[in-house]
Amino acid sequence: MSKLIHARYTENGDSGWNGKAQAGDQTGNEVSVTEFYIAPWDFALRYYNWELAKEFVIIAKKLAGCVKVGYDQSQRNDLYKELKAYNFDVDKFILLGKKVETDCSVFIYACLCVLLPNLRSDKNAPTTDDMENFYKNKGFTVLKSGGYLNGKKNITGNIIVRAGHHTAIFQSDVDSVAKYPTEVDSALTIIAQAVLKGTFGNMPERKDKIYRAVQDKVNSLVM
């Protein structure tokens, strides 16, 4: 069964704005791994580097299994701040860090910041309303077809989002990530063979034709 890794709710089953939530995971369910479920997801985000996507999942599962990370929207940026204090060393934070809170979108953002320094910022982290615009120019592809919303086409490391509501990290029950590079290699081989055959010609527009062919292949792989 495919899984979701996500920050879900406080120990009181709410968002935390009433000030009653305590730092850290009080129940083991505030930030946790659950079975994948169908919801009105709006889109998925997929990072272009699949080795990094797998590392992203490993980091998320470490933090989800750590009692130091709980849920509270009113203290949503605290996980990011504490990871920054330990130079984004997750193991050191788990060993030495203080108990903190996060929410669904900052949990994902903080995990990604461990691996992608270019994302790091002390500003308020992106919310589910901001995630599409925030990530789409940072190496992520936005995927909106039905297969990504019901889980059938998602692969490990995809991020699924319901804007204004919730977001989670997808972990497949099959090793889809290992298959994807084979599809990419096959597509590149087809284009390379076309170049060698002179399919794109030798005129100045040759570069544009090759670019369009590559883009068409990319689109076919992610749709």
Predicted features and spans:
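Solvent-exposed, polar/charged alpha-helical surfaces in well-ordered, non-transmembrane soluble domains
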Residues: 58, 105-110, 189-193, 208, ...
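Acidic, gly/pro-rich intrinsically disordered regions characteristic
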Residues: 178-186
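Loop/turn positions that initiate beta-strands
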Residues: 155-158
